[in-house]
Structures are given as structure tokens and as C-alpha cells.
Amino acid sequence: MAVANGLIFSQEVGPKIEFESLEVDYGEISKGDNGVRIFKFTNTGSEPLIINKVYSSCGCTIPKKPSSPIGPGQEDEIQVKYDTNRIGPIRKIITVLSNAINSPTISLKITGNVE
């Protein structure tokens, strides 16, 4: 805590997660195309960030999380693989659970269309 002019300021201590983007748009892709996309994030907090679980709203989307804690100031990524053999619109949610004090649960979105 810091005191200035009689006011008390406290800074939250702990891991914080900040994603570059909460949505990835595949755009128009062809059946069988590469379905892997990346969500990049940074631990902007003061303690190690642990991604506890990442899951998808559908079995057609397979997320992959970091296996080790992410130190303060470090960057990492959540990899998402969509089954592009499924023709039609892509509208899926990937949920990330972590020990982040600012957002312990985050919903990521993928959109697009497989032709």
C-alpha cells in the first residue's frame, strides 16, 4: 500500500491475464484446410499465472493449454484446432479457467465459415 496526501492506494497482487484478442475469425475457409488458430496472452500480474482448464462448447473444437505456469511479464498461447471437415458456419466458444485475479474465467470466440 502507498499513502499520498492521506489517501491509501493498494495495488492488487497476483497473476493477471490479458489476451491480444478474445475472438478469432477464420473467415471463409475450404473443407479440410488447416483448422489451427492461436489466442495469445500475457501475464500482466505479479505472480505466476496457471491455466487450470480450457474447454470448448463442441467436440469439433480442440483447445490446447500451456502445461507450465506463466511467469509475470511472460507471454503464451491457447491453441485451438477446429475440425474443418464440418461444412457450414463456425460459431464456437472456448472457456479458459485460470488463477488470474482480474478474469478467472474468460470466454474466447471463434467464427467463420467452412465451404
Where are these regions (language model features)?
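Bacterial Sec-dependent N-terminal signal peptides
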Residues: M1-V13
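Short, solvent-exposed loop/turn segments enriched in Ser/Thr/Gly
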Residues: K31-I38, N85-I93
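Asparagine-centered strand-capping/turn motif at beta-strand->loop junctions
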Residues: F41-G45
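Short, hydrophobic/aromatic beta-strand segments
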Residues: E47-V54, I106-L108
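Beta-sheet-dominated interaction scaffolds and their linkers
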Residues: S10-K40, E115
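Short strand-edge motifs at loop-to-beta-strand transitions and within beta-strands
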Residues: V24, Q74-V80
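Short, solvent-exposed loop/linker segments at beta-strand-coil boundaries, enriched for Pro/Gly
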Residues: S57-K64
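Terminal connector regions
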Residues: I87-E115
